[in-house]
Structures are given as C-alpha cells and as structure tokens.
Amino acid sequence: MNRCILLLLGALLLVQGLHVHKRQQKLRTVSLKKQPTLRETLLQAGSFETFAKHRHGYKKYLKTNGNHHFDKYQALNVEGEIDELLRNYMDAQYFGTISIGTPAQNFTVIFDTGSSNLWIPSKKCPFYDIACMLHHRYDSKSSSTYKEDGRKMAIQYGTGSMKGFISKDSVCVAGVCAEDQPFAEATSEPGITFVAAKFDGILGMAYPEIAVLGVQPVFNTLFEQKKVPSNLFSFWLNRNPDSEIGGEITFGGIDSRRYVEPITYVPVTRKGYWQFKMDKVVGSGVLGCSNGCQAIADTGTSLIAGPKAQIEAIQNFIGAEPLIKGEYMISCDKVPTLPPVSFVIGGQEFSLKGEDYVLKVSQGGKTICLSGFMGIDLPERVGELWILGDVFIGRYYSVFDFDQNRVGFAQAKTADGRPVDPAPRPFRSVFDNESEESMEQDDE
C-alpha cells in the first residue's frame, strides 16, 4: 500500500515538473519595424515610371513562367534553383533583426511566410554587385562557429537570379539560436528591388517542401532543437502609420494581448506556401472566388493579389481609376466612405475597410492614394489563386501552425490593446437573407 502511494506521489511530482518546465520555456517575440516600401521610395523620388515598368515586367514574367513552380515543386532540381514566382518585395515594409555567427553579425530581414530559405549578402560578393555592396554582408572569416557547405544555389525572381552558396552558422532570432543552421550567402542580387531595399535579406518561414536544396528553414530548426515551446508562430502587424511599433512575431506560440478570440482555423491544403481554401470574396455581391479558391497568407508583400479580371471587378466596386500599367488610384477624400471588401474564410467573413486596403504614398510633396489590390495572371493549369498580404494580415492576427497544418485568423488589437473593428462574423449571403424573407412571407 505504502509503495503504491509513493509511486503515485512520484508520478504526480514528475507531471508537475514537466508542467513547470513547459512554463519556463517562454514565448519568444521579434519586434518589427515598419519602413517605407520600395514603391513609396520611388514615388517620393518622382520615379513612378521606373516603379511601374519594374512591376509590369514582374507581372509579365509571372504570366510567361508561372507554371514552373507549381509542377509538384519540381524546382528542387540538381542545380538548386527555384522559381519564387510570387516573390516581389517591392511592397515589403515590415522588417526585423537577426544575428548570424560568433561574435554576432546583425542583419535586417523580411520574415517571409511565402518562401522557405534564409539568405543574406556575402562578404564574397564582387565589388560591382551594387545591391550587395550597399547592405550588411556576412563575413564567414569573422565567425568562430562558421562551417563550410559550399553547395551552389539560385533563386529566380522576376528581375533576375539571386545567386550564392550554402554555409552553416549559428542564426539567432528572438533571443534563441539555431545551431549549424544552413543559409545562403548571396553573391549576386538582381534588379532595382534589392539595390534600394531597406532590408539585407530574406528569412523564409514557409514549409521545408519548397526550400532550395531541401535546406531546413530557421524556425523548423529552432523547434527541432527545442528552442521554442510549440511548432507554430504568429504575426501581429501594426497598421497605424503614426506608431513607432511596426509589429511582432511570436515564435512558439500565440500572444493573447494582440487579438480577440476566437481564432478561425482552416487546414493547409498543400504543404509549400501557407495555402488554404478561401470560400469567396464579397462586396455588395460576390466579387471573386465564387466557387471557392486557393489562397496564400503571405507576409512578404503588403498587397492583396488575385486573378486580373476579379481584381478589376473589385477596383470597379471601390471606384478606383486606372493609373498606369495595372496600378489603380482612388481619391483620398473618398477613403472614409469606401465600401468594405470581405474575404470569406472558414465560413467567417473577414472585412477590410477603405482605410485598410488603400495605400497612401507621397509623390512630389503630394499624397496620392493607391488601391491595395493587384491583378496577377497565372497560367490556367495553376488554377485560381489569391495572395493575402499585409493589407489583410495587418488587419487580422495570423497564426501559422506546423503541428496541425493549419492557418488561423482573428480580430487584431491596436498597439494599446483596443480591438480593431469590425470583428469577423459568420458569412450570410444575399441568398440566405432572401430565403429567410421568403419563409417569413410564407408564414404570414
């Protein structure tokens, strides 16, 4: 009897100890800074033509080459080149700091849920690579924890290839370090995007399945090495332009201070991007995705992108006027009265107000308002695909869960803890309302 009691007490103490250990492994957060996008930088310099030509060339590239990436991720080839066809970074604006090596070398990166590799400029890039020379560069000779790998790799963007090679070192983020983490030292960076970029490199947070050379992403290494408590991370972006706080990423959990329950979860439909089924896009009626479609939650762009014809329907609905090469402008005076555009996900309606989907930028000392919706024509075989960037994620707290292969969205809070209205609500179509009214009339 006494032996049984002792065994029971021992088991209870063991369980209690496990709980204490779990509590001691705290959540890790990365503070994000919000910077002007390259779009805004070019516009402020009066270079709209340069910006538009660059964006037009990117979309033309998508139309021509958009099928490569979607053929069962065939881009994981011998040469280690992958087509990051949805990557642009012209509109990226949320950046955070990581360190690599011992002693630490600091870099500003985009935490990008639309790609899976970490790359930063290399000290070994040639002097004529302007993009590389204008940013912080990793020096392997200065790090005592550096390990050589040497595999060559390239990532094809709309403006050319980022080329480099794989190295290993300690990569630290949010106060924890991924030891012997493979990453790419970039020796060639393409186009104006990376020359004028406010960031040094990219830290991909999508699934390992789309990583160049099968390199394990940083977050997955952190979880594997037991540096974070749970196999998920979450994004809170602050859309207030007057706030110094750009946002936060929580590694290994969810920050209850940043959102209002409940979280609406939808399953990942394909392990690669954070891809899920979206029910439809609605305004006064259905504007797009009428029969359901695939969508991607993407922190690497600030825009919302979709099939060109459906995006044009949205532009017409909100009263946007064509500007140049696919760009649309809205009168800034009309922003407060613009109609909401809603995205139905998991049966819930997530609405964006005019102030959410309009981007205000300065050009020649004047403020102009641009639509945050962009049309992209992908090959027919790819199917209907939408990209929900920071215009959406900035409005809704977003959870990326590897363990349960799901994405979650919830009503976000402001930096001072106030809920950002409106809250998500169950979707009820016009047909539902008409049906109810018809039933009421029949009862009478």
UniProtKB/Swiss-Prot annotation:
Glycoprotein listed as a keyword: yes
GO MF terms held by the record: aspartic-type endopeptidase activity
Active site: 112, 298
Disulfide bonds: 125-132, 289-293, 332-369
Peptidase A1 domain segment(s): 94-410
GO cellular component: cytoplasm; extracellular region; lysosome
Glycosylation sites: 106, 433
Signal peptide: 1-17
Main location: cytoplasm
EC number: 3.4.23.-
Disruption phenotype: RNAi-mediated knockdown prevents muscle degeneration caused by bacterium A.dhakensis-mediated infection. RNAi-mediated knockdown prevents neuronal degeneration in a mec-4(u231), deg-1(u38) or gsa-1(Q227L) gain-of-function mutant background.
Comp. bias (Acidic residues): 433-444
Annotated compartments: Cytoplasm; Lysosome; Secreted
Swiss-Prot/TrEMBL GO biological process terms: apoptotic process; programmed necrotic cell death; proteolysis
Region span, Disordered: 413-444
Record keyword Nucleus present: no
Tissue expression summary: Highly expressed in intestine and to a lower extent in body wall muscles, hypodermis and neurons.
Keywords: Aspartyl protease, Cytoplasm, Disulfide bond, Glycoprotein, Hydrolase, Lysosome, Necrosis, Protease, Secreted, Signal
Family: Belongs to the peptidase A1 family.
Function: Aspartic protease, which is part of the necrosis cell death pathway. Involved in neuronal cell degeneration. Involved in heat stress response.
Protein name: Aspartic protease 4
Natural source organism: Caenorhabditis elegans
Lineage: Eukaryota, Metazoa, Ecdysozoa, Nematoda, Chromadorea
